[in-house]
């Protein structure tokens, strides 16, 4: 292993592929602590819809970046990177191996590589002007604000749902600040690794994965997803950005009497399958992953392959 960079293990893969189970085995074998790389598991009281690991499933392995925010608090790749970097230092200092587990690709990418966004620094006067314009736009409805965005950045408008007011506003703010379109913005990324990273991924055939996703949704509903979402709505979180996540946005209309549970269930399964497909495409296009086939390999064989890869780094 490289001596000048901390060693970390990163485990990626689509939703429902079995990352949680394998991560526990990895942590047991390599004296690891797990950092969640999931954009939703940071939120308290959003357990069932995020398939959050339970205390029993943790098997005594320390887990970080879970239940750290209220549902109405913002969270971003930038915030994740800052917190994860500190945790990696702490875990390494304890003589343990940081194991980052997640399906949010941008979070993983931002942590592994030097990754930053274009500078948006502007003068104080310009900043005040932008804020004044935004304050006026804040009077618009979601649909009106979305239409305003579409008037100059149609691509971003197509990519962002009208109800995702935060992202719509952000795209407008970026344009007002820079006179550039958010859709044409290029992220500045230097492919310099911040860590000595063993990047693993779990995969399986699409048919089997989709079956697992459908089953997982059924289990979520049996475990009380409807009650969880109802409680969040009653607590005033219905319009929070976190409630736009898959697993929640499909159930809110049921709570409000707009659609049936059967219709919501079908939507949730479809959205989850679509998300899994996007995840796999992203991981395979953006990251250099050592893929482990869960259908062809037992957990034991997967662990053996990890041992081989670690041994190679030591020689």
From Swiss-Prot:
Gene Ontology process terms (BP): tRNA modification
Residues that coordinate or bind ATP: 13-20
Stated family: Belongs to the IPP transferase family.
Function: Catalyzes the transfer of a dimethylallyl group onto the adenine at position 37 in tRNAs that read codons beginning with uridine, leading to the formation of N6-(dimethylallyl)adenosine (i(6)A).
PANTHER family found in the cross-reference section: TRNA DIMETHYLALLYLTRANSFERASE
Keywords: ATP-binding, Magnesium, Nucleotide-binding, Transferase, tRNA processing
UniProt protein name: tRNA dimethylallyltransferase
